[in-house]
Amino acid sequence: MKSAFERVSEITDELFAVVHFAGVYMLDSLVEMDSAAFERIFKINLGGVYLINKTFLPLLKSGSRIVITTSELAPLDPLPFTGVYAVSKAALDKYAYSLAMELQLMGIKVSVLRAGAVATDMLGVSTDALDRFCKNTTLYACNAERFKQIVDSVEARSVSPSRIAEKTLRILSKRKPRFAYSINRNPLLLLLNVLPKRLQLWIIKQVLKQK
């Protein structure tokens, strides 16, 4: 990271924006997953953003922007088996809001883009992770195949990376950007989230229980 900062500093002494798109996906049971994998997703999805912002802050001036792509899941209640990914993105969303509170004092604006499924290689990773989970789980074998059908239906409604890029450019062009923006959010997930938590739990249990 230090060498990256030094190379950028050789070219310019000021950045208008730092934009975060990178992240990793994980699908697994919270009680079956490897502890190293649990730590890794937070180190990348949250720790990576923290480290980049901290490193490149000297190049950000009043009027500069930071845009962080989180997930449509970030403000929602987590679903089973995608919990660790959703929690890492929720933590990233909270980090971004706290960062916005701090950096506004320096004239730097922070926004998040909460995106639904995007047609990138991550969808393939998601499918592979789901297949691996369905094959390896010993506690939820009766539920896994049904969950696979649900995830497949959610991910079928994806947008292209160019749509994300266009949305990001629009955010950067705004004189007074909002903190949160959304794109391609799944209406069924939004509907589930407005229900009482007790009802959410019951619905998920009915959907995933063994027939």
Predicted regions and their residues:
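Active-site helix of classical SDR
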Residues: 53, 88-91
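Hydrophobic positions on the long internal alpha-helix
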Residues: 4, 19, 52-56, 60, ...
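Alpha-helical segment proximal to the catalytic Tyr-Lys
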Residues: 58, 101-102
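Substrate-binding pocket helix/loop in short-chain dehydrogenase/reductase
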Residues: 29-30, 37-39
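SDR active-site lid
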Residues: 105-178
